[in-house]
Amino acid sequence: MFNKFNTKPLWEVSKTLSSVAQGFEPADMVIINSRLINVCTREVIENTDVAISCGRIALVGDAKHCIGESTEVIDAKGQYIAPGFLDGHIHVESSMLSVSEYARSVVPHGTVGIYMDPHEICNVLGLNGVRYMIEDGKGTPLKNMVTTPSCVPAVPGFEDTGAAVGPEDVRETMKWDEIVGLGEMMNFPGILYSTDHAHGVVGETLKASKTVTGHYSLPETGKGLNGYIASGVRCCHESTRAEDALAKMRLGMYTMFREGSAWHDLKEVSKAITGNKVDSRFAVLISDDTHPHTLLKDGHLDHIIKRAIEEGIEPLTAIQMVTINCAQCFQMDHELGSITPGKCADIVLIEDLKDVKITKVIIDGNLVAKDGVLTTSIAKYDYPENAMHSMHIRDKITPASFNIMAQNKEKVTARVIEIIPERVGTYERHIELNVKDDKVQCDPSKDVLKAVVFERHHETGKAGYGFVKGFGIKRGAMAATVAHDAHNLLVIGTNDEDMALAANTLIECGGGMVAVQDGKVLGLVPLPIAGLMSNKPLEEMAEMVEKLDSAWKEIGCDIVSPFMTMALIPLACLPELRLTNRGLVDCNKFEFVSLFVEE
């Protein structure tokens, strides 16, 4: 695969690199006195130099003969050097930051490349949204490697999205220079039941010899998992149990260990390696979804490496999991992922391996960050008008919009979605609720809130009604346009008045997240770019998110990253019960179910 993510292709500079390695020409940069973390052999090689030319590595070893008058020399002074870190699965939209601001935030932490699945913005704006994010990334040093969204909508027939992506669209995007594969194939039922659409988008990717990324959340690891992998899917980030992760690795599937803002899977899935003493070559560390306050407080892959080490994974193994393993997963290890001759000169200097403290970051042979601060400029991208005005709701939302009716009854037994804090799954519960004036009442005493999803893309007027449990809210309401994956307007709350205020607040600001109580807005994060992102800097976004978290606590919710958990309520490809703008979905059987249980 031709790498568009370096300043110059190898074939164009091969003569120069060979000459520099032999001392016939001086290097552009030489790193001296380093302790090389060799991810190819999983060892530390002392007193190693690295010569760099044309944005690539020319020599690893003694590089004194490569130094000329114009060569920039960086003395590592005994620090470790490692390949730049690669995040194998990330939705930038979940950071609420633009791509350029995201790059500014993560590069100083050693992240040199991301495999970005922009299926959030694609669900709102279609492939135009993907193009906008690609353009946004071009002004940054970060290597923005993009996978075409595979499931827009996530599960066809169960929700309304702003756009749809089919095999023909995938075929076209595989011609784009920035596309390296197919985004997570969430429609595993479509693969297992051999639908033309699911196999069509996978097939177009395989025809282009690019990587199909996966999403297999079922605990079944027998014939279903085998069939899924056999279709061409190469990796999966949805393992939450060690046995699932181990089963996938044993079948040659790159298994991505997730540690994000809300999903803390590493503690459990790391046992696949530490508890079984198996080869880790098919294991990758990823973030998936990370909020701005997490990036500001903890960092990015540097933090995830540290967490892996804390869970008992050897430091060199953890670094392999964000470098060569990831590059091999995407069939790009001939370009990325190791400090070896010919590869992209993407290098991080690490003061110590225990705390994974990054002191310098080099991308394509350029020093781009030092001591946690970006040392290069990043161009700001202005998103087009259609991206900035994405709220299209047909009917005016009032308190009456939240009525759930049950004629001539005093009580009903409702299907209720119970969330699992810090996990992506849900439980289906059957709970008795009171009816007053033919209107079903939520019951905060039982931790049961009302939930409504309004379609916001095409002014259809469709809305889905349900109940949720597990947030702990006693009084108030929350709303968000970050509601995976269709990103319709999701509102949950204890009373119709606060729910209407929450919904209308987001309509007025172009989307985002809000918490209200007693007719007052307690916390608001405006996200005007497709209702998903903002152009504001990380620090400002983190402050707003912290205030929103405080607002959540004020109204009674103390779970970790509650908006991320809330955002998965409509995601119909995850078990067990979900709510979309079309109604309640049994995600084990993939069929609509009634809100009320028949007695």
Curated annotation (Swiss-Prot):
One of the entry's Gene Ontology molecular-function terms is: adenine deaminase activity
Q: What is its EC number?
A: 3.5.4.2
Q: What cofactor requirement does the entry state?
A: Mn(2+)
Among Pfam families, the record links this protein to:
Adenine_deam_C, Amidohydro_1
Return the CDD domains for the record.
AdeC (cd01295)
The UniProt keywords, alphabetically, are:
Hydrolase, Manganese
- EC class of the enzyme, as a word: hydrolase
What is an annotated GO biological process for this record, any one?
adenine catabolic process
Catalyses: adenine + H2O + H(+) = hypoxanthine + NH4(+)
Question: Does the keyword field hold Cytoplasm?
Answer: no
Q: Into which family does the record put it?
A: Belongs to the metallo-dependent hydrolases superfamily. Adenine deaminase family.
The protein's name is Adenine deaminase
- Please tell me the species this chain comes from: Clostridium botulinum (strain Loch Maree / Type A3)
